[in-house]
Each structure stands twice: as C-alpha cells, then as structure tokens.
UniProtKB/Swiss-Prot annotation:
Name of this chain's protein: Argininosuccinate synthase
Family statement drawn from the similarity comment of this UniProt entry: Belongs to the argininosuccinate synthase family. Type 2 subfamily.
GO biological process assignments: argininosuccinate metabolic process; L-arginine biosynthetic process; urea cycle
NCBIfam families hit by this protein: argG, PRK05370.1
Top-level class of the enzyme under EC nomenclature: ligase
Subunit relationships: Homotetramer.
One cellular-component annotation, GO: cytoplasm
Keywords: Amino-acid biosynthesis, Arginine biosynthesis, ATP-binding, Cytoplasm, Ligase, Nucleotide-binding
Pfam families to which the protein is assigned, alphabetical: Arginosuc_syn_C, Arginosuc_synth
Keyword Ligase: yes
Organism: Afipia carboxidovorans (strain ATCC 49405 / DSM 1227 / KCTC 32145 / OM5)
Subcellular compartments: Cytoplasm
C-alpha cells in the first residue's frame, strides 16, 4: 500500500508541520475548508529569526486547526549537534571550511519529535512544506516512518487541486484576505532561509547563480564581516570539554547545553565564524549551492579537533576522519538513526570523545580567521621533550636508535626501486631528460 496520498483525505485527522508563514497558513485554512480535521505542530528549534514561538500555535487555531502544539526540540537538537561534533560527521567542505550539516540535524529531530507528538494525538497522516526537488522530502519521509510505521504522507504541494487553486504566494495571500485574515506578503528576499539553533541555511533564487556570492546575504547569526564598515575586534575565547562534552566557555560552566550553545553562537557570531559557501550533491545526485552560518558548531568543532589531534594517535585520527566523512553522508541522506550510522557514531563517541578532556584558547578575528593560543589537557600525548632540538636528559631515543630504524627502511626502499624499474621497462614511466625522477608517460604537465 502506498504511504503517499495524492489528494486530501477528507474527514480524517491530518497533521501539518506549521511554521506560521504564508505557505503553511494558507495550506491549513485550505485543508480545513476542504473537509480535513487539521492538527498543527510547530517545532521550537531555537530559530534565531523567530520572535515569538507561542504566537504560532495561536495563529493555527485562528485558521481552523483542531489542535495546535508547540514542541520544544532544542535540547534534543543540541544533543544531536554535539554528537555530530564528537564523531566529525561533516562530509561537505570547501578549502578546509566545513558545512556542519545543521539542516540535516534539524530534520532528524523535527521528523521524529513532531511525528511522535502526532501519534500521541491519534494523527497518522502528516504534511509538511518540502518540495519534490529537495532533500527534505526524503528526510522527513524516512524519519516519519521510522517513528510511526502506520504513517501516511499528504503534502498540499503535491496535490494538483491545491496547486491549481493556490499555486503561488500572490494567490495564497489573496485567499487568506478573502476569508477574513489580513495577511501581507513579506518582502521578497533574494534567497530563502531556514534556520535552527545549530545554524542557518541560505539558498535558492539569486544564490542559485554562482556569480551571486556571500555578499548578498544578510547574516542572521553573525555579522557581515566582509564589509569595511563592519567593526570586528579580535577576541580571546576559551572552550573546555570534559569526556567529549563541551562544558565551559571563557571559564563559565554551563549545566544546560542549550544555554552553552546560545552563548557560543553569540561569541562566534560576533566574528562571522562558521560562515561558508558550499556546492554539494543532493540526495538525488543533482548539485545545489548554499551559504551557511554555524558560529557555535564552528567554535566547538575547532576546539574539539585541536584536542583530538593532541590526544589521539595517527591511526585513530585517520579512522575518526574517514568514518566522520561516511557518517556525514548518512546524516545528509536522512539516515542518522540507521544502524550503520549508529555504529559509526557510537564508535567515535566511545573511543574518541571519551578521551577529550581539556581546554583550548583561541583568538577569533574576522570570519573564519582565528589563531589557537593554548591547548591544555591531562590526556595530551604531545610531549615536546621527545623531539626537542635541545639536549635533554633521558631522551626517548638515541642517534643509534634512529640509525637502526632508518636501516630497516632499506627493505621497502629496495622494493620500491624494483617497482619503479619494472614500470619503466613496461612503458608506464619514463625518465625526464636531465632528471633521475621518473614521470608518468602520459603526464604532460
């Protein structure tokens, strides 16, 4: 049996993820008038651009909802954000600057917590505003059915009758006004924005064109650090972790992780830390472009990785990075709670994060420009005396030890020389005239 409904199920309970914006307001009123019993659910994700969360359910009731609930998702979202930092679950980056998967993390929490609330109310049909070209339609589909296997999906934006009657924002605004709800369309921005406490995503419209850059974006979590008239002063910041958990900023201890994230957002946001411009592959393999903000995630990630490199050995760090790339893709695809993701995540949290105790001090400047000033941890395996260029007592190894180690390298050096000679004989390599360095025959550089 198909779980996707192509037309409105009249007379049935239908839940809608309600944002209070024009689209979901018009959809709620339209579904009510067409005979559905509409239940509205709003996720409080700590969106930085939302002024009054309590007003949103009240609006839903005015528009005809049978019931309207505000579901506080902030603690769970911050918990998942910290888990992503602990496991390095970030696979998209440009020039070493990462996208922190803040929207995929938000969808994982929204999709599970709202559907759980619907299930409590006897609502087994869910609608949201995701379009068929994006990632969210699949993320919400997966998380919804994981939470409630009896769930069916109804999306007004996939219903041809809804599209014919209310196909655009102008039609929606006129529809609301005609039914006694004065609803002015907000000024049209050059891009769309989606946000939560972990970060903000700016995409679509003008940002679909690669010759429109970050300068057209008005940050909602930071400052336009690229502007000459934007004053940004250098700031010294300390971040402390205990067994992988961020616990203190600038010496202030936080027992509430949400409060810590809000403060980290404020600190990082003063500098525009964590803003990035990324080209990525959507789930359906088409490329899209987004400009992202994530000041707290960036600040915590920098400090966490500094401790990782000072505490763990090379092979552990390699596995952490490789597994993190894979886990980041799974998160992006809406598979954050799949078994293969849980396996990678739990491994990093247990064997990497548990050792991460210490404090990192940074100097933040403009954007992603920063310096690390100090790194302290009782678990550091960094020991400068081991490699000191000065004469030290009780050295970890002697010149004679190194001679023996280098002599052992003769084995693999000899093997490598034989392979290079073999490749030259078969024509795979050729010696550059006047040089003893072999080159690939097809290397025209």
């Amino acid at each position: 049996m198909s779980t996707i409904l192509k037309s409105l199920p009249k007379g049935e309970n239908v839940g809608i993820a309600f944002s209070g914006g024009l689209d979901t307001s018009a959809a709620l009123l339209w579904m009510k008038q067409k005979g559905a019993r509409v239940f509205a659910y709003t996720a409080n994700l700590g969106q930085p651009d939302e002024a009054d969360y309590d007003e949103i359910p009240r609006k839903a009731l005015e528009f005809g909802a049978e019931k309207a609930r505000l579901v506080d998702c902030r603690t769970q979202l911050v918990h998942e954000g910290i888990a992503a930092i602990q496991s390095g679950a970030f696979h998209v980056s440009t020039g070493g600057i990462a996208y922190f998967n803040t929207t995929p993390l938000g969808r994982a929490v929204t999709g599970t917590m709202l559907v759980s609330a619907m299930k409590e109310d006897g609502v087994n049909i869910w609608g949201d505003g995701s379009t068929y070209k994006g990632n969210d339609i699949e993320r919400f589909y997966r998380y919804g059915l994981l939470t409630n296997p009896e769930l069916r999906i109804y999306k007004p934006w996939l219903d041809q009758q809804f599209i014919d009657e209310l196909g655009g924002r102008a039609e929606m605004s006129a529809f609301m006004t005609a039914h006694g709800f004065a609803y002015k369309m907000s000024a049209e921005k050059a891009y769309s924005t989606d946000s939560n406490i972990l970060g903000a995503t700016h995409e679509a419209k003008d940002l679909e064109h690669l010759d429109s850059g970050i300068k057209i974006v008005n940050p909602i979590m930071g400052v336009p650090f690229w502007r000459d008239d934007c004053a940004v002063k250098a700031e010294k910041v300390s971040v402390r972790f205990e067994e992988g958990q961020p616990v203190a900023l600038n010496g202030q201890t936080f027992t509430d992780p949400v409060a810590l994230f809000l403060e980290a957002n404020t600190i990082g946001g003063r500098h525009g830390l964590g803003m990035s411009d990324q080209i990525e592959n959507r789930i359906i393999e088409a490329k899209s472009r987004g400009i992202y903000e994530a000041p707290a995630m960036a600040l915590l990630h920098i400090a966490y990785e500094r401790l990782v490199t000072g505490i763990h050995n090379e092979d552990t760090i390699e596995q952490y990075r490789i597994s993190g790339m894979r886990l980041g893709r799974l998160l992006y695809q809406g598979r954050w709670f799949d078994s293969q993701a849980l396996m990678l995540r739990e491994t990093a949290q247990r064997w990497v994060a548990r050792a991460i105790t210490g404090e990192v001090t940074l100097e933040l400047r403009r954007g992603n420009d920063y310096s690390i000033l100090n790194t302290e941890s009782p678990n550091l395996t960094y020991a400068p005396e081991r490699l000191s260029m000065e004469k030290v007592e009780d050295a970890a190894f002697t010149p004679g030890d190194r001679i023996g180690q280098l002599t052992m390298r003769n084995l693999d050096i000899s093997d490598t020389r034989r392979k290079l000679n073999l490749y030259t004989q078969t024509g795979l390599l050729s010696a550059e005239q006047g040089s003893h360095i072999p080159r690939l025959d097809n290397d025209k550089s």
